Amino acid sequence: STRIDLKLNKNNINNKVINSSISGDTTQQGLNRLNLVIKNNPDIVVLCLGGNDMLQVVNPNIIFKNLDIIVKELKEQNIIIILAGMLAPKEFGIFYKNSFDNIFPQLAKKYDVIFMPFLMEGIALKKKFLQNDSIHPNKEGVKIIANNLYPYIKKGVEALNNH
């Protein structure tokens, strides 16, 4: 969130950024904490959940259901949502991969939210941008994610200003 803060400030966008993410969170854990996020009265939420569910091979229907509830509740609060999608590696098998990969575009279409198709674009499977676990981004990877995410956040801020 610090990188996003700096980028927003550099572009004269002075919204406050609150990082409510917890490393390792699943969609169920995100759903359990949703009321805490809503209590902060955010104008915009960047929703980046689902990757940890995938790593635990959680049924895509459950992931969809959890994210669906989260997006629905955020929408009911008139919060602008930026949904960051994830993609399953082919090692998970074609059925799981297809089911998982379709969750995010389906939700984006259903709720008409700002949609970033793949949060890890440009860094997934590239060791130089990943921590030793080959999953999470390192500092350089985080920079790339922040740069990739920025246009979507800018779109969210513009939508907020047009409210």
Stretches found by the model and what they are:
Residues 3-6, 10-13, 29-163:
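Alpha-helical cap/lid subdomain in secreted, periplasmic
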Residues 11-26:
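A short beta-strand-loop structural module common to alpha/beta enzyme folds
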